[in-house]
Design a protein with these regions (language model features):
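Structured mid-to-C-terminal alpha-helical surface segments
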Residues: 1-183
Length: 183
């Protein structure tokens, strides 16, 4: 059986985009655990973060910043605490202190993801301004560039950017993949 599986770096990148665009406690919790994981290739994570961030529906990834990392105490008490043991936040001095500590650590460790090179900015400008996918300025290996350029979400994004720029304000229709029929 051939089952496609996402690379761990793509999964981490998806969490990094969610961390900034949703500002949810669960994403901050995950990010804090991720920054402690050994053997991650942060260059791959950055490339995948740019790909996923550029694909975001209503967020301009060029404006992403480590300062956007964080969450509200109410999100922890309303959603995250039910997934953790009762006294999880006590060791940190409570949920507010946990947010302060973890936010500072994540902002420091993840800051390089938001420091764009000229090539990375050119990639984002191409996607978001002209509806073009050209990953070559990013300086990533050919296999990574090919994966970025083939990304379905990014292709849908550029289709919408082109339509929007031409005056068509309706979103492009998403096409569904045909179901596979197993023998």
């Amino acid at each position: 059986m051939n089952v496609p599986v996402l690379d761990i770096h793509e999964i981490v990148a998806g969490n990094m985009v969610a961390l900034v665009t949703r500002r949810a406690a669960r994403d901050l919790f995950d990010a804090h655990r991720i920054i402690a994981m050994p053997n991650l290739d942060w260059a791959k994570i950055k490339a995948a973060t740019l790909m996923i961030g550029a694909s975001a529906k209503s967020f301009d990834w060029r404006t992403a910043s480590s300062e956007a990392i964080g969450c509200e105490v109410g999100d922890i008490t309303g959603k995250l605490t039910m997934c953790l043991h009762d006294r999880y936040f006590d060791a940190f001095g409570g949920p507010a202190a946990w947010i302060e500590k973890v936010t500072a650590e994540c902002r420091e460790k993840l800051a390089p993801l938001f420091q764009l090179t000229a090539g990375e900015r050119a990639f984002l400008d191409g996607v978001l301004e002209r509806g073009e996918i050209d990953a070559s300025p990013m300086g990533a290996p050919e296999s990574v560039r090919a994966a970025i350029e083939a990304c379905p979400a990014l292709r849908w994004k550029v289709q919408n950017v082109k339509a929007w720029k031409s005056g068509d304000k309706s979103p492009a229709t998403r096409t569904r993949r045909r179901r596979r029929h197993d023998p």
